[in-house]
């Protein structure tokens, strides 16, 4: 429906509307930092959080590498919508329910709309940079996990249940859903178990860009 409304509008209107919709992701980050009295567990280092922060940058700058990166990173929001079991416990139409599902829906949908509305062109040449940037961010986030967990242990920081807090951004420490559990069963080592996902990412990106690659060859 959003695509139908915007497809004949000029680029400024398209960008402005998508920027407004992307604010749900930013507001969700702020909400989680404030609402649960444990901001260290809700820092914006998950894949979908980083995606939420990158969407406005891509929309404002029209940067091709960032825009094409979003196509891969939006998958994190889709996975969160499908397999996050804790979200199933949210009270229907509560603030928590709405901020979670609205923000993740837009974090998945806006990157698709960016390309469908031709605000940024699809470019298969960005596949290497997308994979390299993703790997670098994953490495950085893993070290953030290690550093924060050491800080938590030293300062004995505990959650509302009295358990020692363990941060697990981007799930580099341990799996949090059946899909990641499969890879952890193959390689039961923190961080390393996530790496076999990159060949899958590569195949996913090739499938997305194949029509563009074929079209470009025909145009030559």
Predicted segments, located by residue:
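Membrane-embedded alpha-helical segments of multi-pass membrane proteins
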Residues: 1, 44-54, 70, 101-109
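Alpha-helical transmembrane segments in multipass membrane proteins, preferentially the mid-helix core
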Residues: 2, 55, 106-125, 138-139
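Membrane-interface helix-boundary motifs at transmembrane edges
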Residues: 5-16, 60-66, 117-128
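Cytoplasmic-side transmembrane-helix entry/capping segments in multi-pass membrane proteins
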Residues: 15-17, 43-46, 67-74
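Aromatic-anchored segments of alpha-helical transmembrane domains
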Residues: 23-33, 73-86, 134-143
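Membrane-interface transmembrane-helix boundary segments in multi-pass integral membrane proteins
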Residues: 129-132, 150-205
